Amino acid sequence: SKAQADKLRQKYGDEIFEKSFHKPDTIWTLPQLIWLREKEPETFGEIKYIFFEKDYVRYFLTDVFCTDYIEAEGSMLFDCNKMQWDEKLCALAGITANMLPPIVKPTDVIGKVTTAAANATGLKEGTPVICGTTDTVMEVFASGAVKKGQITLKLATAGRICVITDKTYPDINLINYSHFVDGLYYPGT
């Protein structure tokens, strides 16, 4: 999706950045959807709903379609200022916001394990299921970085330095996400 990200950056880069706090690149959902629309139009035409990975697993367990705001922030289809799906960004991808999941908090109990899921997995029917969130924010949280000024260093396939703040720092060179803790953020490299 490099060509699609490059085109987005050239034509809509500033507008996308103002809403998503990220520059168009191959890691975001928006250019990936455009790639799918251009390269696999039949498959794209069959899309009814768009799930993020963890949300699909949770849907299998609960029959509830939703995602958390941190996951949404990583899609480049979400207005981080208004904390909602952005119709114009969705239109760039060739979709509408109603194809995307309702937004909830990562800690919200969104449903319970259904009978069908219990039978398929061995999990106890009726077990409460929370929304959950992205891997990196949970790594930041689990490392103990839960106060302004704390820093985490992630050494993995994709290493990151994350500084905990009480506001976003929109910068073309940073990746900005909300923290798991209300009112905090973790912009980083």
Model-derived regions: residue spans:
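Glycine-rich phosphate-binding/catalytic subdomain of phosphoryl-transfer
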Residues: 1-189
